[in-house]
Amino acid sequence: MTTARESARLSGAAWYADHVRLTIDIPADPTSGIRVTAETHIESLLDPGNELPPLELDGRGLVTHEVAVDGHVLGETEFEASPRSLRITDFPRSGVVRTVVTAPVGGPGDKGFAWRPGLLSTNCEPRGFRRITWSLDHPANRATFEVEVVADPTLLRTVLVNGDLSGESRTADGRLATSFVDDVPKPSYLFALVAGDLDVRSVDLDDAADGHALERLAIAAPPDLIDGADFALAIVPRIIAFDRATGGLPHPHRTLTFVAIPGYPDATEYQSLMFFDPAVLVADPSGHVDDDLMLVILNTAHEYGHHTRGNRVTVRSWGQLALKEGLTVLTAQNDTRRHLLGPAARILDVLDLRRLQFPEEVTIGAPVVRGEVDDPEALYTRTTYLKGAEVFGMLRTILGDDAWREVTTSFWERYDLGSASVDDFVEHASASVPAVADALRSTARWFGLSGRPALRIDTRHVGGNVEVTIRRTDSLRDEPCVGIPVALAAVGSNGPVASIGPDGRTATEHVIVLDSRESTITLRPDTGAGLDGTVVSALRGFSAPVDLDVSLSPAELALLVRHEADPVGRWWAAQELGIRAVDAHRAGTDATAIIAVLAQALGGALDDGIDDPLLAALLLTLPDEFMLGDREPMIDVDGVSAGLAVLRSSLGHALHDRLLGLLRAHPDNPDGREPSDIAARWLVEPVLALLLASGSTEATAVALSEYRGPHAPRALRALPPLAPLEADLLPVPYDDLLAEGWERWQHSPKIIDRWLRAQSGSRRSDTVQRVAALASGPLYDPTDRGRVMAVWFPFATRNRVAFHHPSGEGYRIFVDEVIALMPTNAGLVVRLVGDLLQFTRFDAGRQALLRRELERMATAPGMPDFAVGIVNGLLNQGPAA
């Protein structure tokens, strides 16, 4: 086992803090600053005999009142305090530093202490602890903590800190001193404190049988939100059970508390005490929709997973962030979603990657998954999280599920409560399973790859065999080539058939690791029947995050839509047919024949019966306009939009009666909050989008009936398809429909968020004006993360045809908001700006308008350095060819 000290030494650290005792004195007005006394036990990591370097502690914005070493108060000449560090030249090989400071409240990104009305909280990842006290604020350093918080209980009635409550006492002035002990060593970025007006709900967990320490799951929230904790209290025990069944380490604490903090930026997995924006933890008791429940599931799964995987072995440096975040997205977040929703949920992973991460690949600031940077905030990207998960997923595909479980379990055990690097994981896996070591190492080169490979797969039937040629078609210059695992199956009219792969193994699926620019393999029949009539399904399960082009005919793709057992392969074939139809329309050729093949394939699949409503919903969802546009050097906003409109209308006509029947076959369960209920409601929006595009009065009547239904989670799914309907097809004016919704749901903020999303994501010609009105109206609150996402996320990241209105007005109103938000919530803004970052890929008129807005961003006050650097880099590019 690699100890925490050994891990820290490998990071290059000369000093190590193994214990921290804090006294945090909160005044009646916390915004005036907080007095923090810290006693930090520090020792040298250098071998005896080596000259000791000065001890340098990290700090930001601290007012220093006293510095002492082993009880000796240092004079002004015995230490040097700068705005960024505290330097002590003559520090012994082992000693205790005592500092007394006033720490600021508020500041860049609300790091350190932050005050929100009624609540004081901390925000320490990645470098916030240095705004609380002088410290060795590095991720490889782990220390145990004792913390005493002194506060007026009439002002801050609930105090929570990492670890276990160890005592309470009254001070001489009548305030309450609350003490906590955390005996599990943690890096400083996992320190957490919250104090204020919070209620707590909890459930007991029975863990005696499996040796886990965790006995109690608690949720803390402001009194007006606490009734929404019931969903998380019900779903998180299932998440915990799944985590344990799939290799998570035992949780080290008796109590695990999730805290809803209004205005908190997203979610963070502080040790035993996790902080969340309420939108991703509590289901608003006044009303919520399925998206809210899914956010709770995904965020609680992700942050819990850190406790048993991604922070039990933390990162040796911030450049290795993907080790904790990518692995956690894969094994906690995505795997949990598939566990609860079924295999088709893998398609949702692919959609997230395409919509959120792929745009980062084409910007000048596109980060690699792993890399050292001056400001670790720059690493909190979709590339680190989502692409990082896919790279680890490729390693899992190569290893196979059983070997992956053994490798990860032994890795956690080896480095438990220490730190490691991505390379440590790769080498551990390679040593554990040497038969695939070369494939693992070649695939691990993805961690340093900027950009996305593209594959062309050609198949040829020869004498009962199938020859498969896999060829790289991208212009990336990775040398040696990264490994790309390609999962293949020969699919016939009864599903995948067994074949003999190039390794001599008989299976229905073969994984080929392409580690060159081109390779040809042969699949041979397992029986005398041969493989004639089969179709090769490639990249099953989305085995690698690449662009894929295939030589399959429309009829062959249709066979996959009908008979492929892998949900991703089936969905991809339907998407490919849709893409070809849109491209035909853009090229000015007749798309009728291709659309007919797709309609027949989808109709046949519906007639055969699709047991999983989520899979049915995703098969019926048209290709995403962002993915369609992003395939080519120049993004054809208008052509893609027009092609999708034709495809939508044609499928609506062809599948009309089947779609009506599908809705009837999946009626709503008004009380249903199970994942299966959510999956059934997923059907409503894509089915109505096709039906309404047919222009039938029956479709309009059904859509209005759905919208006026009694259950908001289903009713609101009908609003986006109704929004772009022409006035002559909609018997009720659109504004009247919106007014109906407002009348019903005005007292339910989460439902109103969905109501707003439907408007900002609409393809209506007046969407830009509507978004501007919403952003300047009384419903908008820029400090409310959920409300910001409701107005801007659909508009800027899901609605290219409206956002890129030729007037440029969409850009202007959006950049106004970016400039306002970036100084305090850069992490949120990063999720919204994908199209700004690829401005040179649009037509000349749009490029000029986008350039003007980027120039505004580059010179706006309060923009973080990393953002200014990215924007200036983009502006220094020449226009696209």
What kind of feature is each model-predicted range?
Residues 46-52, 72-73, 167-175, 206-214, ...:
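Short, glycine- and charge-enriched coil/turn segments that flank and shape catalytic ligand pockets
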Residues 1-254, 284, 357-358, 371, ...:
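Acidic/His-enriched low-complexity segments
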Residues 41, 87, 261, 313-317, ...:
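Conserved short loop/turn motifs at secondary-structure junctions
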